[in-house]
């Protein structure tokens, strides 16, 4: 179960990166709540990069190349889409403070987006934070069938190519478990995170 660690409206990008390095991440009660609080789950969602699983049906869809997959071309649009309230997601924890913080992290090279495009339409995507050899997945959205799933596949491919060692999903969902996500005890996660933080910051972007 998630354990809030207190509210702090004065969070800077530097404090945010430090928090990630010790196993904390921020959330808001709602999109309308200006405050954010730290979360440290007792069980941490992790998607092992060496045990990532793709279903046959999804693999077939990927071979058909239904979308143009891009990295970091419209980060702000991705986080805005993740923050939208939809019929399947009536509430969201992404408030204006979080959007501003992660936009700054993007501009300094620590937050990244994977995007699915259909022509000039953004139809799916995800975003997260890179630090050391870890990538912390934050949120995803989909406006077309399988768009976010395909973005996740491309994320994992890139992380493997760049020698990342940890893909943190914060929590697990039934959706993520189909890809191989597991619940990792906090102590075990802390050891894995510490090792990832010993690495220099790995490059996620092509630039």
From Swiss-Prot:
Keyword Transferase applies: yes
Keywords: Acyltransferase, Cytoplasm, Transferase
Molecular function as annotated in GO: leucyl-tRNA--protein transferase activity
Listed InterPro entries: Acyl_CoA_acyltransferase, Leu/Phe-tRNA_Trfase, Leu/Phe-tRNA_Trfase_C
The keyword Acyltransferase appears for this protein: yes
Family: Belongs to the L/F-transferase family.
Function: Functions in the N-end rule pathway of protein degradation where it conjugates Leu, Phe and, less efficiently, Met from aminoacyl-tRNAs to the N-termini of proteins containing an N-terminal arginine or lysine.
Listed name of the protein: Leucyl/phenylalanyl-tRNA--protein transferase
């Amino acid at each position: 179960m998630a354990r809030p660690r207190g509210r702090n409206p004065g969070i800077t990008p530097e404090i945010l990166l430090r928090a990630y390095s010790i196993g904390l991440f921020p959330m808001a009660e709602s999109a309308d709540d200006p405050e954010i609080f730290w979360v440290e789950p007792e069980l941490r969602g992790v998607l092992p990069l060496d045990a990532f699983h793709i279903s046959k049906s999804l693999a077939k869809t990927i071979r058909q190349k239904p979308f143009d997959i891009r990295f970091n071309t419209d980060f702000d649009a991705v986080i805005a889409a993740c923050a939208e309230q939809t019929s399947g997601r009536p509430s969201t924890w992404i408030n204006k403070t979080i959007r501003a913080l992660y936009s700054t992290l993007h501009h300094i090279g620590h937050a990244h987006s994977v995007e699915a495009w259909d022509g000039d339409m953004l139809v799916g995507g995800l975003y997260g934070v890179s630090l050391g050899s870890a990538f912390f997945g934050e949120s995803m959205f989909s406006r077309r069938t399988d768009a976010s799933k395909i973005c996740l596949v491309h994320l994992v491919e890139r992380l493997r190519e760049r020698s990342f060692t940890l893909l943190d999903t914060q929590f697990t969902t039934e959706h993520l478990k189909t890809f191989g996500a597991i619940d990792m005890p906090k102590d075990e996660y802390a050891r894995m995170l510490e090792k990832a933080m010993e690495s220099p910051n790995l490059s996620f972007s092509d630039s």
